[in-house]
Amino acid sequence: MKKFLLAAAITAMCATAFAAGKDLKVAIDATYEPFTFKTADGKPTGFDVDIANALCEEIKRTCVFVEQPWDGMIPGLLAKKYDVIISSMSITEDRLKQVDFSDKYYNTPSRIVLRKDIKFSGPESIKGKKIGVLKASTQEKYALGELKTKGVEVVSYDAQDQVYLDIKAGRLDGTVADILEVGGGFLGKPGGENYQFVGQELFIPKYFGGGAGVALRKGQGELKTQISAAIKAIRANGKYKTINDKYFKFDVYGK
């Protein structure tokens, strides 16, 4: 009996050691600058990527990034194509029906962006205008619930950078996007100078949830606990601030 218990203990220890050292496959959508995008030589980078690497370091795993179009993120996770999603995915009630989430690692608002010559006094004032959004995003959910119902034409895209290409081409009047993503990307680049934020910052929980977290399959309780603890650790040890300050001028962790 003692030999059996000893063997079981050794097996458990080996399994734990193996889990700690193995790769963690992380899904990203590399079209969402400055959160996830590619360098000139094709390597993934951005706030989400750096956060993922910091979390992997804390839990003694190695991040292996898997590129996935946004609307296939959760189906790919459920199909076990990767272990987690670390790609600015908001924690919403709808998503929690399918997957689990760690604690949040940032929380920033979204906002409507329109051409400067368009007068905005509320959704009704842009009836007939055409707004582009990322398919399966919280911004799409908001646009369908609050803008389309007021007569705004909502067009969904597979990637956010496709939205900006069509805005520049004159096929769209604007977008709804994360304030940091669009502010640090499209609005600050050539082609974005004729567009601006309108209306209030959008934090509506039924659309935008409670911040971005790491998505996992249900039943991965131990990994979920480890990642949430790792988020707290990098907040405490200064790694989070170093990453944050590389991309942003204020703490995006939020309230």
Descriptions of predicted regions:
Residues A20-S88, F250:
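Extracytoplasmic small-molecule ligand-binding "clamshell" domains
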Residues T62, Q139-V155, E193-F197, S228-K255:
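Ligand-binding clefts/hinges and TM-proximal coupling segments of bilobed small-molecule sensing domains
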Residues R61, M89-S90, R95, S102-G151:
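A conserved helix-loop-strand patch within extracytoplasmic ligand-binding domains
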Residues G72-P75, S87-K97, Y142-E146, D173-F208:
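A ligand-binding cleft/hinge motif common to bilobed small-molecule-binding domains
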Residues E57-E58, V66-E67, D71-V84, Q98-D100, ...:
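Short helices/loops that flank or line small-molecule/ion binding pockets
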Residues K38, A52-K60, Q139-D158, Y164, ...:
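Ligand-binding cleft/hinge of the Venus flytrap
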Residues A30, N107-L114, G191-S228, F248-K255:
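Periplasmic-binding protein-like
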Residues D50-E58, F120, K129-K130, K135-T138, ...:
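Extended ligand-binding regions for polar small-molecule ligands
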